[in-house]
Amino acid sequence: MAPVLQSSQPWVEKYRPKQVKDVAHQEEVVRVLTNTLQTADCPHMLFYGPPGTGKTTTALAIAHQLFGPELYKSRVLELNASDDRGINVVRTKIKDFAAVAVGSNHRQSGYPCPSFKIIILDEADSMTEDAQNALRRTMETYSKVTRFFFICNYISRIIEPLASRCAKFRFKPLSEEVMSNRILHICNEEGLSLDGEALSTLSSISQGDLRRAITYLQSATRLFGSTITSTDLLNVSGVVPLEVVNKLFTACKSGDFDIANKEVDNIVAEGYPASQIINQLFDIVAEADSDITDMQKAKICKCLAETDKRLVDGADEYLQLLDVASSTICALSEMAQDF
């Protein structure tokens, strides 16, 4: 089938909820923030949770519902991971924006337009500790005229003095049912055909990240047209074919290092990312049948975790996959080895 005509707008933006009440699967957060919008007086806020669950969407929706399109640009400052947010930026750009007072007479019909500004710091957990400490003083000094919205995946990376000054909102991972409903809505709007198997595959490979699922869907549509299959989605997602990972695990179960080494050579030759191999191998091991004991699973998973850390640190992928293969063989053969 010929590819369907597509606009240049990313579907992530096209189908981003414009109001807080439209955010999916975050009922408690939506209920509290809806009450906040009615009073038009919000505290500093900290949104945390897995990626693709609606944190940024919620922050933007609050700002738009408070100020409307006309005042939004002058009242809201957005900074994300692509911006320099070191200590110098906190002391200059953020402080300068926070310090400017706003009058209550600048109102837009239909919007509360409270007399404060909002600074949205996306991926705040990537800010240095020095920058966060500098930001604490800015929050204290200009709290009457500026509200801060922090967005992060890991709340543990936000220093306590900042976190304690914010109302915290935890965003739950999206269930497969919620993701499926949203994906089907987009398919209906775009005239796409997506069968049950493809829908299940999309939910699985996106791992609860709705933003990622929508991106995969749009990419598959551009490449393969309006009828999308599971294979199409696997091709655009970068997921390693299951048979490739199964072959590696089967080779390790054989106890023959030469066979396992050959499978590692094939994986490297095909250019599959080692980190993705590790993730999928973990799932296979965790779901393995009763011929593998819990202790063997624990040893293999520990090795996979250590390998994943080394890959993040820049270790050679070929050597790390060989280490995984040999360690898995040892664990499955119950050879004495210190893991």
Curated annotation (Swiss-Prot):
Subcellular localization: Nucleus
Domain of life the protein comes from: Eukaryota
Keyword Repeat: no
Matching InterPro entries: AAA+_ATPase, ATPase_AAA_core, DNA_pol3_clamp-load_cplx_C, DNA_Rep/Repair_Clamp_Loader, P-loop_NTPase, Rep_factorC_C, RFC_lid
Gene3D superfamilies reported in the protein's UniProt record: 1.10.8.60, 1.20.272.10, P-loop containing nucleotide triphosphate hydrolases
Single GO BP term: DNA replication
Annotated binding of ATP, by residue: 49-56
Sorted UniProt keywords: ATP-binding, DNA replication, DNA-binding, Nucleotide-binding, Nucleus
A cellular-component GO term for this protein: nucleus
Pfam families named among the record's database cross-references: AAA (PF00004), RCF1-5-like_lid (PF21960), Rep_fac_C (PF08542)
Main subcellular localisation: nucleus
The keyword DNA repair is assigned to this record: no
GO molecular function: ATP binding; ATP hydrolysis activity; DNA binding
Family: Belongs to the activator 1 small subunits family.
Role played: May be involved in DNA replication and thus regulate cell proliferation.
Quaternary data: Heterotetramer of subunits RFC2, RFC3, RFC4 and RFC5 that can form a complex with RFC1.
NCBIfam families, A to Z: PRK00440.1
Name of the protein: Replication factor C subunit 4
Organism field: Arabidopsis thaliana
